[in-house]
């Protein structure tokens, strides 16, 4: 997938799936499973993963543009997407000895069948 194709796919997901339900999802606190499914089907969940595992092999410029496009339609989904890409990058950065375990996970991510994330906690603050 090229930069242009990724941005076009992000615009399609944003206009067709995100924008119509963003306001209602914000009001009700609903998580948009449809948005994640659309991102997976579009190939955007594997945006920065290497071609060898089925990803698009694209870089930070495309990631930033895609994320901004999603955020214009639904900031919550853009945040989920951001955390997914960072989670996938963390998995990708696993030590080489973990390669037999990591490769199948990366292939699932690139195929749009796995959503990643990260969890953060700050000392002195309760975790939810």
Identify the residue ranges that each predicted region occupies.
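N-terminal hydrophobic or amphipathic helices/low-complexity stretches enriched
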Residues: 1-6, 10
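Glycine-rich flavin
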Residues: 33-41, 46-128
């Amino acid at each position: 997938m090229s930069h242009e194709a990724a941005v076009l796919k992000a615009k399609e997901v944003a206009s067709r799936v995100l924008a119509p339900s963003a306001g209602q999802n914000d009001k009700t606190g609903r998580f948009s499973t449809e948005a994640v499914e659309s991102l997976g089907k579009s190939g955007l969940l594997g945006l920065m993963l290497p071609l060898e595992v089925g990803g698009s092999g694209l870089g930070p410029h495309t990631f930033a543009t895609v994320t901004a496009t999603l955020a214009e339609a639904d900031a919550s989904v853009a945040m989920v997407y951001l955390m997914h890409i960072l989670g996938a990058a963390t998995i990708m950065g696993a030590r080489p000895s973990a390669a037999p375990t990591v490769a199948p996970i990366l292939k699932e991510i690139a195929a749009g069948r796995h959503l990643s994330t990260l969890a953060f906690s700050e000392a002195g603050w309760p975790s939810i």
